[in-house]
Amino acid sequence: MENLQANLTLIQQRLAAASDGKYPVPKLIAVTKTHPAEDILPLQNLGVTDIGENKVQEIMEKLPALEKNFRIHLIGRLQSNKVKYIIDHVCLIHSVDRLSLAQEIDRQAQKHNRVMPVLIQVSPCGEAQ
């Protein structure tokens, strides 16, 4: 845990230095994919508020232990048919890579009376992803 605290402090210092006091300090998202909930919970005591998971099934398995303690981000590719499972449980969906997915996110968010923030993935060269 001491190593984790030291690494986290170093990262936070680097983020603060990068913002140089002129910009907001970037939000740190601890990527917790593949780690069990019991290994993730101690991060709360270190001040971590946001975690990233890349699989819907993993989010759903860890949800009972983590949802009240962290803001959960979906990082990585999301299939349209799985949006309904996470729409009420994540704070941000990263890597929206196609219009049909954005439309499904919007459809499911409306059903749950919420607006879902997303990050759009674009290819500057027009390459298929």
Regions found by a protein language model. Give the residues of each.
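Conserved alpha/beta-domain cores
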Residues: 1-129
